[in-house]
UniProtKB/Swiss-Prot annotation:
One Pfam family hit: GlnD_UR_UTase
UniProt keywords, alphabetically: ATP-binding, Magnesium, Multifunctional enzyme, Nucleotide-binding, Nucleotidyltransferase, Transferase
Gene Ontology BP annotations: regulation of glutamine family amino acid metabolic process
GO molecular function: [glutamate-ammonia-ligase] adenylyltransferase activity; [glutamine synthetase]-adenylyl-L-tyrosine phosphorylase activity; ATP binding; magnesium ion binding
Domain of life where this protein originates: Bacteria
Residue numbers spanned by region Adenylyl removase: 1-440
Organism: Salmonella arizonae (strain ATCC BAA-731 / CDC346-86 / RSK2980)
Region (Adenylyl transferase): 450-947
Protein name: Bifunctional glutamine synthetase adenylyltransferase/adenylyl-removing enzyme
Enzyme class per UniProt: transferase
UniProt cross-references to InterPro entries, sorted A to Z: GlnE, GlnE_rpt_dom, NT_sf, PII_UdlTrfase/GS_AdlTrfase
Any one cellular-component term (Gene Ontology): cytosol
Length: 947
């Protein structure tokens, strides 16, 4: 055992003052002194439970004691009679064993590989013990879940990630997936439940037993987001549902996650064998699959961007050469060749490294270095976390904890530890780059830059000076450019730029100027880029990104030249620079139906309980996707319709995630309304109106939303803080509004307008579906029925969606007096024009003026309300383009007119998109779009001017 260093001997005196009664400095062994000095977690635990210290002093922890965990826990739970006492015993048992593991680890009494095994067995023992106790309790209450043949059905739990691999770290979340074999009902209970309901309730109670903080702490933070469909999917799935999902919808990243999946408490029974056999083909392909390398490279890029976004430094898990890169190296071989090589199918990393050596897939020396680095990094990670039982992989900045880690890693001091760490991580990084690499080299050779460009940047030539590299510019442009450079350098003098930042900037700027000054619009482009550079000069990471990745710099210049809106976004949110690294994704937005899944994967990296990080992640994802959509728009790869489609799908993914987050927060506080006990879903819907409802969102569009529920009047919630069910939905809607509008360092998510709800701003924020139907039928104005034409459910249960669709269809197919409707629609349009019309009389407001977009929308809405009672098919779509198609198909409007209005509509909307990209208002010269305006005005007179 390494003697305590001087700082630790000094700290021991603080420890002595806190020792539990009955223990003195002289009565403790040297081992106890060392552990209690090293770990505040161990010290706090034995102060609360002195008998644990006596137990450790009399009998040190053993390497194989994990074999006794199940028996010890069974004894601890013998007298448990309710959920509260179960939760207490689970927490005390976990803490007691964790102190024993911390003791053995700090003193190196047990090998590091065995420590990982002990931590994983402890978690598995607690999960299985809690499940079995709660399963029996639920069976007593509701009966035993059985299939149609009367065979009892178990709850199977997949442990994912390091838990599944038997490599859990000291303070870790646990990633779980719940499954049960076959559908059926419970038998022998006081009331019969569907198996899905039984296992959902059991799963909820199990999560609460493990995850909910009490005065005794918690057992483990439980993360269920790896299950199919994430938080929006069922908590527990049948085998059939699991199989369907992974066969038809399983993503690459889910396949990688499933490599480590292991059934908790697996006793190799028929159900366990069936589940394993079902999942194996999804994970391990029969053919050699080299697409894995690019997929893993993409995942690594996502992690590198996350490190930059969160400002993570000294992170031994996610940093270059860290634990995650070793895991990626091993997964490459598992996923490429695992289908053909059973020895590569191990869930654990170290046995897989042995197989890689045996199969000669990597040089033996590389594998030796990876093994040594992995064990070194995992020991360092566990020691770091055992100091305070805290989930962290970031090296400490304070002297005490650095001294603790140096002692725990058997080094003389902190610099010696850092030296060893640096060597191990460099070895890992080398193997990683050779195998997976990045799309561009980490350190590309410095381009040869001519001396004149350095002169332009570093010497700040005077306006009268001449240099050949600027000779192609007109005199005024040259003066403007040199003034911009001089002003930028003056601005930099006010910033606290360190030596490294200055060095990188001096490498970057000559290259940037070389590219910018080759453009005709050099001064304009530079004026858009310098605010961004001024914002990141103190964040060397982003300067290095632009310096080391010439492609990223090229795309930055091109996009800023094309759009001041993009330049402004990049200046406000520099984290978006990461998106410039991969042109393959930059100019190809996410598939319209994949936004939800991309967002779900993105949010998995953020702790579920960290609301602040969740809010930031949502905003960062939205900004990154907006950048990609705008880049594709500028490049001409997206039509105006496709731009709006992408913006709308993105907004819907955001709504989905915000509702999920708000729901989880509300249920944690109040439980859920009891009318949901007997059914699936949440009894809640979000209806999109206006541009969202009509699939016509622009870059800066608000969201027009209303909220519906189907909660009966007398329902309460089932949580410890019981509230009225309808009050629950009101607070849910308020929470959703809050999550959208909260301003973080990444801005707000969307401006949300809920004034289209029944009775407008004076009405309730959330309305029951029945009240909504009654309002629409008996109180709503014609303009509210017009708004309903462009409305659709963007989030909600199928039951509520059907209810809303039926109300909408009923209202729209109601027979109306043509003259009255014509007058009311026309008068509403005139009223709008007087309030919103263009204040610049010499300009044409594309949206609000006569012959503009709003006129086309009113024509479409009028014709649907006028003729839907005769042609119900007119109610099918909520977007103007398809409504115009329906009007032609149903003989209301001739095909030529419908096509002409569609072309005018898309042309005007395209112009609005491009004006937004240029940060210009939505009006143009009066001479513009005269053909389109004349056509729209003629159509307006035809349909809406009284004869």
């Amino acid at each position: 055992m390494t003697p305590l260093s001087s700082p630790l001997r000094q700290y021991w005196q603080t420890v002595v003052e806190r020792l539990p009664e009955g223990f003195t400095e002289t009565s403790l062994s040297a081992q106890a002194k060392s552990v209690l000095t090293f770990s505040d977690f161990a010290l706090d635990s034995v102060i609360a439970h002195p008998e644990w210290l006596a137990e450790l002093e009399s009998a040190s922890p053993q390497a194989d004691e994990w074999r006794h965990y199940a028996g010890w826990l069974q004894e601890a739970l013998a007298d448990v009679c309710d959920d509260a006492s179960l939760m207490r015993e689970l927490r005390l048992f976990r803490r007691r064993i964790m102190v024993r593991i911390a003791w053995a680890q700090a003193l190196s009494r047990v090998e590091d590989e065995t420590i990982l095994q002990q931590l994983s067995h402890l978690a598995e023992t607690l999960i299985v013990g809690a499940r079995d106790w709660l399963y029996a309790a639920c069976c007593r209450e509701w009966g035993t879940p059985c299939n149609p043949q009367g065979v009892p059905q178990p709850l199977l739990i997949l442990g994912m990630g390091k838990l599944g691999g038997g490599e859990l770290n000291f303070s870790s979340d646990i990633d779980l997936i719940f499954a049960w074999p076959e559908h059926g009902t419970t038998q022998g209970g006081r009331r019969e439940l569907d198996n899905a309901q039984f296992f959902t309730r059991l799963g909820q109670r199990l999560i609460k037993a493990l995850d909910q903080p009490t005065m005794d702490g918690f057992v483990y933070r439980v993360d269920m987001r790896l299950r199919p469909f994430g938080d929006s999917g069922p908590l527990v799935l049948s085998f059939a549902a699991l199989e369907d999902y992974y066969q038809e919808q399983g993503r690459d990243w889910e396949r990688y996650a499933m490599v480590k999946a292991r059934i908790m408490g697996d006793n190799n029974d028929a159900w366990s064998r069936e589940l394993r056999a079902m999942l194996r083909p999804f994970v391990f392909r029969r053919y050699i699959d080299f697409s894995v390398i690019q997929s893993l490279r993409n995942m690594k890029g996502m992690i590198a961007r996350e490190v930059r976004r969160r400002g993570l430094k000294d992170n031994i898990k996610l940093g270059a050469g860290g634990i995650r890169e070793i895991e990626f190296i091993v997964q490459v071989f598992q996923l490429i060749r695992g289908g053909r090589e059973p020895s590569l199918q191990s869930r654990s990393l170290l046995p897989t490294l042995n197989a890689i050596t045996a199969l000669h897939l990597l040089p033996e020396n590389d594998v030796t270095q990876l093994r040594a680095a992995y064990l070194f990094l995992r020991r360092l990670e566990n020691l770091l976390q055992s100091i305070n039982d805290e989930q962290t992989q970031t090296l400490p900045a304070d002297d005490l904890n650095r001294a603790r880690l140096a002692w725990g890693m058997n080094t003389d001091n902190w610099p010696q530890l850092v030296g060893k760490l640096t060597e191990h991580m460099a070895n890992v990084r080398r193997v990683f780059n050779e195998l997976i690499g990045d799309d561009e080299a980490d350190t590309p050779q410095e381009e040869e830059l001519s001396e004149p460009w350095r002169e332009v940047w570093q010497d700040t030539l005077q306006e009268g000076d001449s240099t050949p590299v600027l000779a192609h510019l007109a005199d005024e442009d040259r003066r403007q450019l040199l003034t911009l450079i001089a002003d930028f350098r003056k601005e930099l003098d006010k910033r606290p730029i360190g030596p490294r930042g200055r060095q990188v900037l001096d490498q970057l700027m000559p290259r940037l100027l070389d590219d910018v000054c080759s453009r005709e619009d050099a001064a304009v482009t530079l004026s858009r880029i310098t605010p961004l550079l001024a914002g990141i000069v103190t964040r060397t990471t982003y300067l290095e990104l632009l310096s080391e990745f010439p492609g990223a710099l090229k795309h930055l210049i091109m996009l800023c030249a094309a759009s001041p809106m993009i330049a402004s976004q990049l200046a406000r949110y520099p984290l978006l620079l990461d998106e410039l690294l991969d042109p393959g994704t930059l100019y190809q937005p996410t598939a319209t139906n994949a936004y939800r899944d991309e967002l779900r994967q993105y949010l998995l990296r953020v702790p579920e309980e960290d609301e602040e990080q969740q809010l930031e992640a949502l905003r960062q994802f939205k900004q990154a996707q907006l950048l990609r959509i705008a880049a594709a728009d500028i490049a001409g790869t997206l039509s105006v319709m496709k731009v709006s489609d992408h913006l709308t799908w993105l907004a819907e993914a955001m709504i989905d995630a915000v509702v999920q987050q708000a729901w989880m927060q509300m249920v944690a506080r109040y439980g859920q309304p009891t009318h949901l006990d007997e059914r699936q879903g949440r009894g809640f819907a979000v209806v999109g109106y206006g541009k969202l409802g009509g699939w016509e969102l622009g870059y800066s569009s608000d969201l027009d939303l209303i909220f519906l529920h189907d909660c009966p009047i007398d329902v309460m919630t089932n949580g410890e803080r019981e509230i009225d069910g309808r009050q629950f939905y009101l607070r849910l809607a308020q929470r959703i509004m809050h999550l959208f509008s909260t301003r973080t360092s990444s801005g707000i998510l969307y401006e949300v307008d809920a004034r289209l709800r029944p009775s407008g701003a004076a009405g309730m924020l959330v309305t029951s579906a029945d009240a909504f139907a009654d309002y629409q039928q008996h109180e709503a104005w014609t303009w509210e029925h017009q708004a309903l034409v462009r409305a659709r459910v963007v989030y909600g249960d199928p039951q509520l969606t059907s209810q809303f669709d039926a109300v909408r269809r009923t209202i729209m197919t109601t027979a109306r007096d043509g003259k009255t409707l014509q007058t009311e629609v026309r008068e509403m349009r005139e009223k709008m024009r007087s309030h919103l019309g263009n204040k610049h009389r010499d300009r044409f407001d594309i949206k609000a003026d006569e012959g503009g977009i709003t006129d086309i929308e009113f024509i479409a809405q009028y014709l649907v309300l006028r003729y839907a009672h005769e042609k119900p098919k007119l109610t099918r779509w909520s977007d103007n383009v398809r409504i115009l198609e329906l009007l032609a198909q149903n003989g209301i409007m001739d095909e030529h007119e419908a096509q002409a209005l569609t072309v005018a509509y898309t042309t005007l909307r395209d112009e609005l998109h491009h004006l937004a990209l240029q940060e210009l208002p939505g009006h143009v010269a009066q001479t513009c779009f005269s053909k389109e305006r004349a056509l729209v005005q003629a159509s307006w007179r035809k349909w809406l001017v009284a004869v």
